[in-house]
């Protein structure tokens, strides 16, 4: 990432951070010795200070192995002058075999509601109109804060509190885990005008065999029940998803089951990924089950073509309708050309 060390500076510094840096700091330095700052997942709020130090002292690598202070790990990220991402939770208690997050970020830690509310109020004061709540599994937010009341859907309560903040006009959240998606959350999305009618629900695969190998904690039937529930509660909802193509052991029948879910659910958008073994994950050890690259590429293209057809069909429902657009960018070449998103997250 290119980052200015200060607002007044015209000099950009190079910074690498996140899960990969947390796990493989030596490898990052070996491959990119010219990077000014390498940080992990536990001290992202220190990046500006470290960049300033690097300007005086040269390249810095600072990896903190563990922290119990979530406030040192997060900072609001502005997508534009009117939109910001707000982290409500770090870490993950799940054990998906393709994911490195639990081993490098640790267990789930929820921010205190008061800290979240105060940050969003500050953002609203600065002119931010839209906030996106971030967490590895937002639906489990607050479980660690409510030890004696684990059944309470605290994420839903948080949505109601944020909805009452003056100045904030649109609220989004990502990512929920299908197995933890509660009906109370859907009711909140339906009841609260500021909460966008957009739901991201990661599928990863439509095959029960592959879902089990991934340790996802749900099967195809349960996932589709969640999709049906979402559509029943939220009129004109826009649903997006994640799919991994070519997970170890995936055969043609497994892939076809994924396509069956795609055809049934009719997602507005899919974030598609070709499986690649990530060192340190369980799935990276499934070497004898790896799918050939040519097969992955062919399946990926079939999925892409089909989803393009579905997306075009879904987008046509907006023709001749009035939509509220939050303008995020003005063209540098023509001030009359604006870019923004409607409530469902579609770019116009």
Task: Put a short name on every predicted segment.
Residues 14, 23, 125-252:
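Conserved SAM/AdoMet-binding glycine-rich loop
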Residues 96, 116, 133, 173, ...:
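Conserved, mostly hydrophobic/aromatic
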Residues 253-260:
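Short, acidic/polar
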Residues 1-2:
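Short, well-ordered junction/capping motifs at the entry into regular secondary structure
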Residues 285-348:
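Terminal RNA-binding accessory module
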Residues 79-82, 92-94, 195, 205, ...:
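Short flexible coil/turn linkers enriched for glycine and charged/polar residues
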Residues 6-141, 154, 184, 199, ...:
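Proteins enriched for Cys/Gly/acidic motifs involved in redox and nucleic-acid/cofactor modification
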Residues 250, 264-267:
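Contiguous mid-protein beta-loop-alpha structural module that forms a pocket-lining wall or clamp
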């Amino acid at each position: 990432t290119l980052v200015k060390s200060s607002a007044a500076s015209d000099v950009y510094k190079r910074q690498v951070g996140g899960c990969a840096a947390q796990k493989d700091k030596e490898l990052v330095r070996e491959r990119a010795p010219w990077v000014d700052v390498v940080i992990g997942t536990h001290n992202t709020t220190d990046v500006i200070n470290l960049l300033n130090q690097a300007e005086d002292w040269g390249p810095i690598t600072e990896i903190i192995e563990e922290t119990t202070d979530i406030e040192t790990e997060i900072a609001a990220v502005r997508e534009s002058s009117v939109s910001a991402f707000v982290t409500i939770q770090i870490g993950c208690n799940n054990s998906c075999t393709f994911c490195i997050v639990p081993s490098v970020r640790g267990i789930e830690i929820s921010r205190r509601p008061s800290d979240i509310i105060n940050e969003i109020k500050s953002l609203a004061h600065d002119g931010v109109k839209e906030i996106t709540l971030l967490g590895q599994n937002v639906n489990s937010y607050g479980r660690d804060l409510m030890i004696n009341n684990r059944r309470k859907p605290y994420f839903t309560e948080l949505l109601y509190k944020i909805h009452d903040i003056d100045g904030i006009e649109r609220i989004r959240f990502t990512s929920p885990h299908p197995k933890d998606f509660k009906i109370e959350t859907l009711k909140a999305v339906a009841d609260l005008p500021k909460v966008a009618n957009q739901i991201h629900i990661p599928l990863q695969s439509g095959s029960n065999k592959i879902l089990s190998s991934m340790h996802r904690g749900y099967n195809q039937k349960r996932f589709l029940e969640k999709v049906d529930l979402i559509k029943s509660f939220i009129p004109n909802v826009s649903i997006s998803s994640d799919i991994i193509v070519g997970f170890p052991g995936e055969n043609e029948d497994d892939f076809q089951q994924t396509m069956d879910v795609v055809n049934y659910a009719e997602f507005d958008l899919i974030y598609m990924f070709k499986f690649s073994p990530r060192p340190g994950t369980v799935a990276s050890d499934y070497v004898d089950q790896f799918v050939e690259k040519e097969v992955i590429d062919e399946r990926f293209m079939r999925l892409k073509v089909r989803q393009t057809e579905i997306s075009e069909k879904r987008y046509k429902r907006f023709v001749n309708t009035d939509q509220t657009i939050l303008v995020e960018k003005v063209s540098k070449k023509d001030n009359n050309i604006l870019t923004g998103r409607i409530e469902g997250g579609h770019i116009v």
